[in-house]
């Protein structure tokens, strides 16, 4: 009789499975048949359990008889029944290989249950002996945990000695995480050998020595000398900071920020793939984009750290720290300072730090390449009170189609930057760029003249400030009310007197500065002594005493005989006659700039005049006015337009030139407050004394009217 199997189907499907190959039967026959089926099923179960228990003891393994085939029929709700082909029962036979690590589990046989028809009560099945309990299955083998990559440094022993490969998929099996490779490594001791870039680095020469030096000097710095060296040297070569996770390149001398990606840019540019973290000593691979572990590198770091700790705890101080740093770890007896001396490093020093000389508006300027001539002029301009008030109050109205090319707008930004309160030096690259655009003769990184730059920047500012004059220049071209003309423009009167009829021809020209000849120049010394025209003129030439600024002004305003070779046509006598010329100041500017002419050309030779010129802190310009000259001609009467103290000036800036014509440097002295002077050398600003100021050589002198000054 065929074995009965029951397969559960979804409810409501209308299909039921019946074992055997017959059709319908009477109820009595069905009950009798069900009882026999129960007895057969119980016997088959008992025999099967006994046979499987015997098979487990057999050596070698024997084959199990195949299970009998059965024909299954299905019947639908319509009463049609069809016979399905017999399907062998799938089970683990003895012919299939069994895993040698575990014993085969006994497969329980399906129990036959009687399916009674509705309305019939089946008799209870006869009692059967319970089958013996199957042996307990062995516990499942522990499944190895997949290793998750970590950005921390691996410790020896806590993880496999070799990490996953850089690419992650060794055999191209589609396992980018490298889990299969790692399982091979754990089970059979195979798998990846670590970062290939580290292996390539280890092929090079002296890599161990260089790595030890990096760990010794910049990572495990335990002595005061190494800490000082690390504080001075370990700064980013791009942003000059040491707070953004510094890394050191293992292929060259370069420190870069990891947070700001400066070390990444270096690695990409130089193709240097490895760097060491200077705080933890771990190695980062830029190709793998992860921290990598290497047994040899880890051993070097461990030995270096233990060496330094052993030297720190040693009590011997016979060997100096310098020997330790240069020994290369070959001298095992080298020691350094004891740990007991370290608390002395944190004790306050007896000497106090110098008080900062910082004041608002006093800010250094970066030299962009032979731009010291520009920096000193900018320092002088930014300390003019009226000019400062104009730019800080944003009174400029730009009418240019491209405001980025307006020099007045850039000067406004420069004033705001100088008076922003920042102590870091300012970089005036935009100002330099605009000067190159609007004054092409100053373009380039050649050495330039500070006086020439002053005239150029005033001219460009004047042209870009025409709209600020309120339209007065459109009505009168000779009258401009821009901020540059209000501050710097003065009136220079030239009187030419005919020697025949004594008629005077007067001309008044605007001027932004006054250029003064010096004793020792070609304009002042005797032309009959050509041997005096050497490359350098001493301070004692021509004048027995020390010449002063007042002497130069008197020479500038003296009557000058033009001679027979420079005859001019007189408007009165209508003939060419010899004449005399005298220059005086018709109008005094608010800021008077005096240019001492220290550079001159003698034929094909250029030279610098080093004659010392003394200059006062306060200057009275009354003797050099045109009204003073007229009053002298009227028998000593006081000037008609002279007001007491109106013509007095105070010195507030001095620009000096150091060196020769071919190679020189410009610096400046700036008065920040009354009697407080500072020396400005590009980005370096130091406090200066009045003696330092007055004993300087002087090239450009800036004076401000006392009545309009603001201390």
Swiss-Prot record:
Residues 121-143 have a biased composition (Pro residues). GO terms for molecular function: chromatin binding; cysteine-type deubiquitinase activity; histone binding; histone H2A deubiquitinase activity; zinc ion binding. SUPFAM superfamilies: Cysteine proteinases (SSF54001), Formin homology 2 domain (FH2 domain) (SSF101447), RING/U-box (SSF57850). It catalyses: Thiol-dependent hydrolysis of ester, thioester, amide, peptide and isopeptide bonds formed by the C-terminal Gly of ubiquitin (a 76-residue protein attached to proteins as an intracellular targeting signal). One of its GO terms (cellular component) is nucleus. Changing residue 372 to S: Abolishes ability to deubiquitinate histone H2A. No decrease of total H2AK15ub levels following ionizing radiation. Residues 30-39, 49-67 have a biased composition (Basic and acidic residues). The active site is at 372 (nucleophile), 665 (proton acceptor). It is found in: Chromosome. Residues 100-114, 145-156 have a biased composition (Basic residues). Its EC number is 3.4.19.12. Zn(2+) 1 binds at residues 195, 197, 285, 288. Keywords: Chromosome, DNA damage, DNA repair, Hydrolase, Metal-binding, Protease, Thiol protease, Ubl conjugation pathway, Zinc, Zinc-finger. Zn(2+) 2 binds at residues 236, 239, 257, 262. Residues 1-174 are annotated as: Disordered. Residues 363-706 form the USP domain. The keyword Metal-binding applies. One of its GO terms (biological process) is DNA repair-dependent chromatin remodeling. CDD domains: Peptidase_C19D (cd02660). InterPro entries: Papain-like_cys_pep_sf, Peptidase_C19_UCH, Ub_carboxyl-term_hydrolase, USP_CS, USP_dom, Znf_RING/FYVE/PHD, Znf_UBP. Zn(2+) 3 binds at residues 249, 252, 266, 272. Belongs to the peptidase C19 family. Specifically deubiquitinates 'Lys-14' (H2AK13Ub) and 'Lys-16'(H2AK15Ub) of histone H2A regulating the DNA damage response at double-strand breaks (DSBs). USP51 is recruited to chromatin after DNA damage and regulates the dynamic assembly/disassembly of TP53BP1 and BRCA1. Functions in DNA double-strand break repair also by mediating the deubiquitination and subsequent stabilization of DGCR8, leading to the recruitment of DGCR8 binding partners to double strand breaks such as RNF168 or MDC1. In addition, promotes the deubiquitination and stabilization of the transcriptional repressor ZEB1. This is Ubiquitin carboxyl-terminal hydrolase 51.
